Amino acid sequence: MERLKIVIITGLSGSGKSTALAALEDAGFFCVDNLPVALLPKFLELQNQTVSEVTRFAFVMDLREKGFVSRFENVFKDLEDQGYAFEIIFLESDEDTLIRRYSETRRQHPLSKDKGLLEGIRLEKQVLEPLRSIAHRVVDSSNLNVHQLKAMIQEMGAQKNERKSIQISVLSFGFKYGIPRGADLVMDVRFLPNPYFVPELKNLTGLQAPVQEFVLEKPVTQEFLKKFMDLLDFLAPRYQKEGKAYLTVAVGCTGGKHRSVSVAGIVYEHLKGLFSNVSLSHRDIER
């Protein structure tokens, strides 16, 4: 049986599953939306009986299929027993974001026909919790725009099916917008000198040289970076040794535009020299 890369995209309605599927299609995956979970084994069986150069597949499966929740566990287990390896990506967003998105699109939530929107959202969370618990990756899209979500999903899809190296995501954020869900390590850099209070730097970001110089050249920053890099050098290989596939390192300042962005860039460059699968994103830089 030829080794296939199979990605299952699922999660809460309105959390960005269609955007995620489009991202993988742009990355070269053969994509199917709303495939009944019971048809997945037959689809893969036919694929292995066919001469084809297509080896990467992505499927969106969710509550639009009435029997999805009752069937997915047995189907996924049977596929694993047959030797298939697949990755489940579960997308979610906070309630306020989902409500806003539904208000903007004027679409009906699949579980809100006889209930209010908020009740439908909460019921879906409850129903999908067993699937969320077995997902390989949980992505909170609450504070991601379309381009950021696409980039994140494509980064995941670009990895090899058999990961020999841990995938590390370095993320800058602003504490005023909340700590990123799913972050494994959170570093608060609000103790560093703040460029926000320097008039000529206030409207710049940590991607620009004047801000980077202001933040990174301070003695306290240099001392902090040395200690933080030592900690990461100690922890990351041990996470990998324990079989952890993903590690998210979140660096936060007040607004997520200056200090955290500058420091996250240094952390990214450092880790990129040690691990093959490292990505960098700035959650709140455009706020």
Curated annotation (Swiss-Prot):
Residues involved in GTP binding: 62-65
Pfam families given in the database record: PapZ_C, RapZ-like_N
Transmembrane segments: none
MF terms in GO: ATP binding; GTP binding
Swiss-Prot/TrEMBL keywords: ATP-binding, GTP-binding, Nucleotide-binding
Protein family per UniProt: Belongs to the RapZ-like family.
Protein name, per record: Nucleotide-binding protein Dalk_1358
